[in-house]
Amino acid sequence: MTNGRKMEYKLVDSEKDIERSYEPRRKPKRSRIQLHDWQSMLLEHSFRMNPYPDRIEKYNLFLKTKIPMKNVKIWFQNRRAREKSFYEEAVEVHRDGRRAGHRSLGSRSALFAEEFQYRRY
C-alpha cells in the first residue's frame, strides 16, 4: 500500500501476452453519418448551384440539414472528386469510343463531358 492505495500487479504468463502489451492500441472504428434522402437531395441541389460553397453557404447547409459543418465540407470534397472522375471517364470514353475492360457509358458520358466543359476544376 502506498498513500492509502492498494497496488495491483498483473502477471504476464505467456509470450503472446508480452507481445500484446507492446502492440500499439488500435483506434476504434469511426462511425459514419447516415444521410436521409432529403439531406442528400438538398446537398445535391446545392452542389448543382455551386460546387465550391463558401463558409456561409456551408453554415446554412448545416442549419438546414443538421449535418456537422466538417461533414458538409467533406461531402462537397468527395462529390467534386466523384464528379471529376465521371468527367475524366467520359472524356476517355468519348476520345476512345470505348473503355478497355469496361462497358461503354453511352450518352451519359457525353452529357458529363458537355456539362463539364463549362465548370472550373
Curated annotation (Swiss-Prot):
The keyword Nucleotide-binding does not apply. It comes from the Eukaryota. InterPro entries: HD, Homeodomain-like_sf. SUPFAM superfamilies: Homeodomain-like. It is found in: Nucleus. Pfam families: Homeodomain. Keywords: DNA-binding, Homeobox, Nucleus. Residues 28-87 bind DNA. GO terms for molecular function: DNA binding. GO terms for cellular component: nucleus. This is Homeobox protein HD-6. It comes from Encephalitozoon cuniculi (strain GB-M1).
